[in-house]
Swiss-Prot record:
Keywords: Cytoplasm, Developmental protein, Differentiation, Metal-binding, Oogenesis, RNA-binding, Zinc, Zinc-finger. Residues 80-115, 144-186 are annotated as: Disordered. Coiled coil: none annotated. GO terms for molecular function: mRNA 3'-UTR binding; zinc ion binding. This is Zygote arrest protein 1.S. Belongs to the ZAR1 family. The gene is zar1.S. The lineage of its organism: Eukaryota, Metazoa, Chordata, Craniata, Vertebrata. Ovary. Also expressed in lung and muscle. SMART domains: zf-3CxxC. mRNA-binding protein required for maternal mRNA storage, translation and degradation during oocyte maturation. Probably promotes formation of some phase-separated membraneless compartment that stores maternal mRNAs in oocytes: acts by undergoing liquid-liquid phase separation upon binding to maternal mRNAs. Binds to the 3'-UTR of maternal mRNAs in immature oocytes, inhibiting their translation. It is found in: Cytoplasm, Cytoplasmic ribonucleoprotein granule. The keyword Oxidoreductase does not apply.
Length: 295
């Protein structure tokens, strides 16, 4: 058991100046070090709390399992000038240390791997490694793969002759086709544009049909931007039949066929009593725009 500990047993003010008030602003000046006063005060508070929880618990006298790490804020400034680790000083990094090494004399004329850093490295410590793994591009991997196939083909060409060359060409064609298939997936547009199409709706539950001459869809797709709601059951429907605004028979926006397949007047392209979703919106069905909107 530890004896009772008084949390206010730290060093007190020098009583030589009897007339000094405790509210004086420079009361910390009589201490030898302000940091010692703060450490003793915090240690006293911690020890008082630990004595209330469990008398056997006492704060450790020293830090355990700690490491000194220096952080350089400005990478352009010299590390030795900016900060230090006690007696140790941060090692200075040469300005040309991150540059790629020159190619060897015996190496073939192949594209070297480029090193790209996503952000500036500002931590200098013995734990952090000086070198970072380079980010390999897919194009470099494909070229290296082609070079490996060529080297294997050159060794096998001496034995098999023209048969090995044909296999190499087939392998290169397959790599090119794979690269072309992967290209459209990578180059997807960041923005999606809207276009207007003709939509035909039918609610099987209520047995109601309605048409819309101008339905806002995502460009080159049948994905409707504004859903249609039935006037009775209020169910949302995507048109199961979306076509171009132009008539398929006469190829005109305003149909002039004797037998009209579409019963929509372009002047009133949509029956608002059946669709209350887009009424009053900026992209309403009864408004026609000659330009595209970006989602």
């Amino acid at each position: 058991m530890y004896p009772a500990y008084n949390p206010y047993s730290y060093r007190y003010l020098n009583p030589r100046n009897k007339g000094m008030s405790w509210r004086q602003k420079n009361y910390l000046a009589s201490y030898g070090d302000t940091g010692d006063y703060c450490d003793n005060y915090q240690r006293a508070q911690l020890k008082a709390i630990l004595s209330q929880v469990n008398p056997n618990l006492t704060p450790r006298l020293c830090r355990a399992n700690t490491r000194d790490v220096g952080v350089q804020v400005n990478p352009r400034q010299d590390a030795s000038v900016q900060c230090s680790l006690g007696p140790r000083t941060l090692l200075r990094r040469r300005p040309g240390a991150l540059r790629k090494p020159p190619p060897e004399q015996g190496s073939p004329a192949s594209p070297t791997k480029t090193v790209r850093f996503p952000r500036t490295i500002a931590v200098y410590s013995p734990v952090a490694a000086g070198r970072l793994a380079p980010f390999q591009d897919e194009g470099v991997n494909l070229e290296e793969k082609g070079e490996a196939v060529r080297s294997e083909g050159s060794e096998g060409g001496r034995q098999e002759g023209k048969q090995g060359d044909g296999e190499i060409k087939e392998q290169m064609k397959m790599d090119k086709t794979d690269e072309e298939e992967a290209a459209p997936a990578q180059t997807r547009p960041k923005f999606q544009f809207l276009e207007q199409k003709y939509g035909y709706y039918h609610c099987k539950d209520c047995n109601i049909r309605w048409e819309s001459a101008y339905v806002w869809c995502v460009q080159e797709t049948n994905k409707v931007y504004f859903k249609q709601f039935c006037r009775t059951c209020q169910k949302s429907y995507n048109p199961y039949r979306v076509e171009d605004i132009m008539c398929q028979s006469c190829k005109q926006t305003r149909c002039a066929c004797p037998v009209k397949l579409r019963h929509v007047d372009p002047k009133r392209p949509h029956r608002q009593d059946l669709c209350g979703r887009c009424k009053g919106k900026r992209l309403s069905c009864d408004s026609t725009f000659s330009f595209k909107y970006i989602i």
